[in-house]
Amino acid sequence: MASLRDIKSRITSTKKSSQITKAMQMVSAAKLNRAENNAKSFVPYMEKIQEVVAAIATGTSAKHPMLLSRPVKKTGYLVITSDRGLAGPFNSSILRAAYQTIQSRHQSADEYAVIVIGKIGRDFFKKRGIPVISEVTGLGDEVAFADIKELASSTVQMFSDEAFDELYMFYNHFVSAISQEVTEKKLLPLTDISAAATPNKRSASYEFEPSEEEILEVLLPQYAESLIFGALLDSKASEHAARMTAMKSATDNAKELIDSLTLSYNRARQAAITQEITEIVGGAAALE
């Protein structure tokens, strides 16, 4: 049986750990509130640019390369993770899904390219010998589009240059504070953009200046980049929610452990006192 000193030491260290996890839980809750608001506030912009692009794309006979499927020789994967851990299954779930997808779809490394946001994702793929052609790490808790502008632009440009022929995103979609969904989304080509145009929008008459083709040339890359940024905002909210949940679970587990250790301490202390009394009584009896 552990000594009273050992048990008391474990109680003290567990209490200190629970104070840390409780503080992290509260910090994550505050960050989640801001991240959720950021993600929600970006939705109207993304929906509007999608609506405009869809209206133009469905109303013109011109076809932009970003709207057209082509024979797939190489596939790109954009995987969004975090820079820090202590977020439960947040990173492991998304990385497992992306890795298994790549392994099941491709026989050779020449058939795919990986782009990563987040240090944990970068280290995961490099550890497994999977080359990462582009990466962004060190993002703060509140990200701005400028933080990923270069990566987003270069990713879209690589598709235009036929460095790969299709692009998928893997990220955690925020559902609620206790639920996040691993999501795979086909980003390029934008073959389903016409579905975003409502019947009223399709039938509406627009006059474009400059031409529809020139507008699409500018708007389509911006739209694809906005999808990447929107997924990152979604992922940030999911990260803080997952970390808040993980820290709450750790705090609850610490409390249970403290209760159990306290019970063990009291029992051990009672046994020690009983032993001392027995020895005293036995010693007194021996002197009679």
From Swiss-Prot:
SUPFAM superfamilies: ATP synthase (F1-ATPase), gamma subunit. It is found in: Cell membrane. Keywords: ATP synthesis, Cell membrane, CF(1), Hydrogen ion transport, Ion transport, Membrane, Transport. GO terms for molecular function: ATP binding; proton-transporting ATP synthase activity, rotational mechanism. The keyword Iron does not apply. It holds the Pfam family ATP-synt. InterPro entries: ATP_synth_F1_ATPase_gsu, ATP_synth_F1_gsu, ATP_synth_F1_gsu_CS. It comes from the Bacteria. One of its GO terms (cellular component) is proton-transporting ATP synthase complex. PROSITE patterns: ATPASE_GAMMA. GO terms for biological process: proton motive force-driven plasma membrane ATP synthesis. It is a peripheral membrane protein. Transmembrane segments: none annotated. HAMAP family: ATP_synth_gamma_bact. F-type ATPases have 2 components, CF(1) - the catalytic core - and CF(0) - the membrane proton channel. CF(1) has five subunits: alpha(3), beta(3), gamma(1), delta(1), epsilon(1). CF(0) has three main subunits: a, b and c. Produces ATP from ADP in the presence of a proton gradient across the membrane. The gamma chain is believed to be important in regulating ATPase activity and the flow of protons through the CF(0) complex. Belongs to the ATPase gamma chain family. This is ATP synthase gamma chain.
